[in-house]
Amino acid sequence: MSRAVLALLLLSSFSCWSQNYPARPVKIVVPFAVGGSADVYGRFLAAKLSDSLGQPVVVENRPGGGAVVGTDAVAKSPADGYTVLVMSNTHTVNETLIPKKPYDLMKDLAPITGINSQDLLLVINAELKANNLKEFIALAKSQPGKLNYASSGPGTPYHMAGELFKHMAGVDIVHVPHKGSDQARTAVLGHQVDMMFDAISTIVSHTKGGKLKALGTSGKHRSAVTPDVPTIAEAGVPGYEATIWLGLMAPAATPRPVIDKLNAEVIKAINAADVKENWAKQGAVPMGMSPEEFGKFLREDVQKWSKLVKDTGMKVD
């Protein structure tokens, strides 16, 4: 049989198979604890895809090892489109921060598309004697190593936002990792920890209620959700920028027609007018892009955080 005929038969087989996909439930693995942004938006996506694909799409939370446990499970799953991964900045950070992983992000997983991105909010507990970012930086510099900040775990976007802040502001603030965003948030609200970065959508209500002080947002521009809060760059740390983003990947050998189908359905879901409107109120921006564009985005993000890890000598806590 000639190569051309074989290729044609394989293409026909994939095309027929993908037309019938999915023929059974699809599982979205979220390698983070319940309650964080990845979990919230993963469940949103599951509901939307259940409707559009005509099959149940279920979420399975598999936290552990800084997202390594759940990610490895997906990387080793059958490459048939029935197990996919919600992933984030944590994964691109881990490429440098955790070099001895049981998988290689860019070799063992295939990019599908980006889901959304959000700016973060730098908050401090209300008891601290600082009312703006410059005062907080001055306070931290006056007592190096005494103040601390919470994160949802090593290598998470919240951890990296904190390390980038320390590096650029020139302050010594101790990292206190927690098992998930909910625990980190509770620690700051309970005045057990001084500061944290969190997604605007999940923390803003506590700042409006006076339990926390909002000192700055992490994006290039002020957030529409908190228009009175300056960016960290304009409030005292020029050039600072950090966001949290989410994306979707599948095992590396997943057939391209399946990747394309999932890509199209996700983009359709996140670009719906009602979704855009709802997300805008939460400070989330749709990120729909082609698999190639998302792959390029991932490689660039790996490079960005690799530089910070190397510049600071950062290690997994």
Please describe what each predicted stretch is:
Residues 91-100, 159, 164-168, 195-229:
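A ligand-binding cleft/hinge motif common to bilobed small-molecule-binding domains
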Residues 17-107, 146-148, 170-197, 288-289, ...:
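N-terminal (or domain-start) structured segment
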Residues 3-15:
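Bacterial N-terminal signal peptides
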Residues 18-20, 24, 48-52, 75, ...:
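Short hydrophobic alpha-helices and adjacent helix-cap/hinge residues
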Residues 76-81, 96-183, 232, 245-278:
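Hinge/capping helix and adjacent helix->loop/strand transition within the periplasmic-binding protein
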Residues 23-25, 167-169, 208, 231-234, ...:
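An extracytoplasmic/periplasmic, membrane-proximal ligand-sensing/linker region
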Residues 86-91, 151, 180-181, 197-203, ...:
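Beta->alpha turn/N-cap motifs
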